[in-house]
Each structure stands twice: as structure tokens, then as C-alpha cells.
């Protein structure tokens, strides 16, 4: 696990069958809970639901609300000691929950990729992470369309459908990499640079941040950039990437100022499948923002 400050194990952490605040068995139980709920609450409504707009202009559907309500109930019944912060809660409630997060807090995005879901595009997922002591302790990202369950425990590894997930393929140079880049949240000068002088082989953007991280962890893409992710977007997926051996994280700017603690405010995500590739990728971004790329 590399270069994710808020995911690192404390010096006094002891792993003895239980990794952090969740055991492997509990993680598998969480995966089953999420998969069952996603099948019943999301897939049953896919292609059959209408969307409305929230105050910030983003979309929301009945599926978002029903999935969140169900997981709130099930998490409270199974792990009553941990509160739940959901994307569809109000800002004041979210801030209050963050203030008490050190003792354990679930961070939930019940439907990541709502615009895709509402448009009939089969690329969306569920993201849930357990925070404690200022770090992500464990997480699950579930893709109900492909039935892929990505999971990770801090200091314990990452898995895809229960099989160990490790980045072990040869990393290409940046020019040969496939990029996952969300252009709409980037500064205009950076978008212009991508349009006129892109540094990679090709680029995609699929519309589900949590799955973006996991596709990077499974080496389907090799470099990643997103200009504004919130806590529920990246908490679980970034842990999957870190535990799989990827490199990168959350940043305050394009000059490499790393985010050192989990917060609700949007942050820049920059990552890659290897240290060498990450250094080349982040270096190109810094140079591009300075007009040198």
C-alpha cells in the first residue's frame, strides 16, 4: 500500500486475524449484504425509474433513496456501534457525523453513477467504506451489472470476488497507457492541453467514480484523473487501489499537495498502477498546468 496518508496503518496496529476494525469474515458478510441489496433495490429498478434534481443540480432517483434506506437499516442492525454517513443526507447531518467519526463511521454512496442509471447506461455501483481513527479501515465497491465485488482491508489486501487483487502486470510508459479522465471538472487550461497534446494512448470516462478506482486496481486502465471527488466517491475505491499496490491519492492542487485527512470537501484524484507511471503522470499534469506539458 503506497502513498495514501489517510489509509496507512498506525505504528501500534497489530493484525492478528482481524485487520483494523473489520475481520475478513465481516468484510465478506458486508459484501453479501451490499450485493443482495443492490440486486433487489437497484437492478429491480434499472430501466424503470425516473430521476429528479437535487438542490445542487445533480440527479437523484427512487433507487438512490431506497438503497440508502435499506443499507442504513441493515448496517444499524449488524454493526450498531457505527453510525452511517450517506451521500443523500443533508450537509449539516454529514458534518455532525464527521465530527464523531474516529470511533467508527460508515461512508455510503448508495448509487454511484446515478446519471448513468437514470439514462439506462449499465455502469454504476455501490460504495461503502468504514472510517475510524481518521483513516479508511475497509471498504466494498459492488458493480451489480457485472456482479463484481471489489473489497479491501487496510493493511490486509484487496480482492475481486474473493480472489486476491494485486497489480502485477508490467506498467507501460505514459504514452502507452489507457487513461481514465473526467474532463468536466478540470481547469480549462488542462482540458485544452488534453485536447491538443494528450500524453497517453487513449482515454475513457464512464461516470462512476468508485468503479473508476477499481478498474484502475484491476489494470483495465493505467492512469486516472478526476478534478473533484467527495468522500463517499473515493473512500472505498481508493483503498482498493492502495491495497492492490497502486500509487496516487487525493490532492489539494495539481502541484502535488497531498490530502492528509479525510474531509467532505471535493478533492482532486490522481493515480496510476505503478510508482514510476504515477511519477510520470503527475509530472506531466504539473507541467501542463504551468504551460510546459
Provide a role label for each language-model segment.
Residues 42, 64, 75, 114, ...:
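Residue-level signal for inorganic ion chemistry
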Residues 2-111, 290-293:
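N-terminal subdomain of lithium-sensitive/metallo-dependent phosphomonoesterases centered on the IMPase/IPPase/PAP
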Residues 2-32, 194-197, 214-293:
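Oxyanion/phosphate-interacting regions
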Residues 128-214, 220, 260-293:
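Acidic beta-strand-loop-alpha-helix segment within the catalytic core
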Residues 104-141:
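Glycine-rich active-site/cofactor-binding loop and its immediate structural neighborhood
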Amino acid at each position: 500500500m503506497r502513498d495514501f496518508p489517510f489509509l496507512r496503518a498506525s505504528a501500534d496496529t497489530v493484525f492478528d486475524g482481524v485487520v483494523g476494525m473489520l475481520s475478513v469474515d465481516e468484510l465478506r458478510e458486508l459484501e453479501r449484504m451490499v450485493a443482495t441489496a443492490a440486486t433487489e433495490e437497484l437492478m429491480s429498478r434499472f430501466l424503470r425509474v425516473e430521476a429528479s434534481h437535487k438542490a445542487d443540480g445533480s440527479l437523484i432517483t427512487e433507487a438512490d433513496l431506497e438503497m440508502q434506506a435499506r443499507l442504513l437499516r441493515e448496517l444499524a442492525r449488524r454493526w450498531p456501534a457505527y453510525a452511517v454517513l450517506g451521500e443523500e443526507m443533508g450537509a449539516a447531518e454529514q458534518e455532525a457525523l464527521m465530527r464523531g467519526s474516529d470511533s467508527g463511521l460508515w461512508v455510503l454512496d448508495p448509487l454511484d453513477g446515478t446519471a448513468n442509471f437514470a439514462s439506462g447506461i449499465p455502469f454504476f455501483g455501490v460504495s461503502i467504506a468504514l472510517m475510524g481513527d481518521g483513516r479508511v479501515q475497509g471498504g466494498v465497491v459492488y458493480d451489480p451489472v457485472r456482479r463484481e465485488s471489489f473489497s479491501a482491508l487496510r493493511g490486509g489486501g484487496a480482492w475481486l470476488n474473493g480472489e486476491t487483487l494485486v497489480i502485477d502486470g508490467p506498467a507501460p510508459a505514459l504514452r502507452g497507457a489507457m487513461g481514465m479522465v473526467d474532463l468536466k471538472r478540470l481547469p480549462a487550461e488542462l482540458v485544452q492541453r488534453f485536447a491538443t497534446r494528450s500524453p497517453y494512448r487513449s482515454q475513457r470516462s464512464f461516470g462512476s467514480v468508485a468503479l473508476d478506482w477499481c478498474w484502475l486496481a484491476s489494470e483495465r486502465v493505467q492512469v486516472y484523473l478526476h478534478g473533484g471527488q467527495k468522500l463517499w466517491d473515493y473512500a472505498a475505491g481508493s483503498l482498493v487501489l492502495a491495497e492492490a499496490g497502486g500509487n496516487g491519492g487525493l490532492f489539494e492542487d495539481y502541484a502535488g499537495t497531498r490530502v492528509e485527512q479525510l474531509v467532505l470537501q471535493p478533492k482532486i484524484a490522481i493515480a496510476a498502477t505503478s510508482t514510476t507511471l504515477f511519477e510520470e503522470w503527475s509530472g506531466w499534469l504539473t507541467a501542463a498546468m504551468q504551460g510546459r506539458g
